[in-house]
Each structure stands twice: as C-alpha cells, then as structure tokens.
Amino acid sequence: MRHEAFWLTASDSTEFHVNHWSPTQEPQAIVMLVHGMAEHSKRYAHLGAALAKAGIALYALDLRGHGFTASFGVKGHFGNHNGWQLVLDDIRCLNHHIRQQHHEKPVFIFGHSLGSYLVIDYLLQYCCSVQGVILSSSNYIQSTFRYKLALQVARFERWRLGKQGRSKLLHWLIFNRHQRAFKPQKTLHDWLSSDEKQVKLYAQDPLCGFISTTQLWIDALTGLQRITPISNLVQIDNLLPILIFGGEHDPIHQGHRLIDLANAFRESGNRFVDVKLYPDMRHEPLNEKNSPRVIQDIIEWIKHNARLD
C-alpha cells in the first residue's frame, strides 16, 4: 500500500488538502470520500488501507474549515458567502484530478454524515462524474417545518454572533439530543461509537469535535432543504447504484430514516439501492468494534458494481 498527501487548488484559488491511499499496482476502482462535520480525512486511514489491499484507491479531501484545509480559512467554516457550493466545487475539482490520473477506472463517491448531504447535492449537479454512491450515516426528514425552524434559530444566532461566530446554543440543541440516548454518559461523544477506545481517540484529536460556525449550520440546513424533495432527487441518474448504511443505534437517523432515504431514491425511479443497518452500532460504523465487517461489505459492494468480481 502507498499513502501520499497533497494539495489541490480550488476554483476560487483556495487550496485544499487530500489524503490518498492506493495499492502498489494501478487500482481497479477509485473511491473519493467526503467526511463529516468536525472531523477530517486522516480518520479514514484504516478504510484506505483495507481498500488498497483489495485493489481500490481512496482519495479523501479535508473540507473547508476542516483538517489541514482549515489552515487556509476559519476552522469549522465553509465560507462567508456561497460556502456550500464552494465545497461542492472542491469535490468536483478532486474528481477532475482523479479522472486525469486514472482515466477510465470506475469512480465511486462516499459521503459520511454531513458529507453524505454534500454528496447528494453533488449528484444533483454532477451525477455523470461517478459510477456509484455510498452514503454512510445519512438522514432523511421530509418535514420542511423542522428545517425552517432550525434555520430561523441559526439565522438568529448568526445575527447575534456573526457569520464566523460559534453558537453554543445551536451546538447544544443538536448534539445534546444525540447524547441523551446513551446512559451512563461517559463522554460528550458516546453517540459516535460503542467502542470507547475510538471515542477517546476522537475526543483527544485536536482536529475533531469543535463547534462549527453559524454560517456553516445555515449552509448545511439550506443544503438539506434542497436535497430532500423527491422532485429534486429525480434529477439523479436512476441507473446509479447506491449503497446506504448505518448503525441501528445511531441517534441521528434512528435506523428508520435511512430506510426513508432509500425509499425516497426508489420513489425517484432508482431500482439499484441497497441498504445495510448494523445492529448495536452507532453513528460511525467504520469506527465500531466490528468495523472490519462493515468495510468488507463496502469492498464487496464496490467490486460487484464495478464488475470486478
């Protein structure tokens, strides 16, 4: 296996950081990964190693305001203006780079949590640039009222604190609800994984667990509003294979809302949607005690849909 880290220049001349894991030979397929909120791409090194062993390369970018990319901006902040679209453009830039390096190899896009919402929005614009989709710990809420209410709170906090302000109220309203599902509460991050070692690693990582800015929350909530309607999902190629997976004990989607997301894609016309719910797992199946099983399922799904098996 080989690992390298490099920088790419985005459409607005900002630079973003990329981690790349690959087999020693030319890979049979490529995965481009979009991580979640308040984490970074290096956390997926174990996935990169497993994929490389299976002959698959992994490219994972640090989102704006995250990981090493944050050195060119504000931590936990996509941008003052149009930040969500700028991140989508970064993903497209990485896709161009992959195409230049690997030409006709099949490319799969992987999004975890917040990254899964970005991936769905990316597909609304650039679905022809990938051959398959993997959504980890995503969510689907049809209630426009809930989004509007959350946006009102976020906009009030932006007015009060500024675009780069950090709202402890927003952070508490969203993450305290996740944490309440688990007792006794040993850390503030118990909802991420049942593996205490992995939770401790997250808590001790200086690039994880920070409070995002009010503007990032507005960007994310606005993006969620756009990707939810079935009338928008029909714009995505209905022949695109999609794998949706998560832990049954994830307080974000609670299991059933992953099924709702799969059904939304099916209702939009896609008949190539697979769903996997893992018992006893929480928000980060890739960082659970039985994560090798999850990773093997991903590898088998990629090989099947890339016609490598």
Each model region followed by its residue ranges:
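Active-site glycine-rich loops that stabilize anionic/oxyanionic intermediates
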Residues: V31, H35-E39, S113, E248
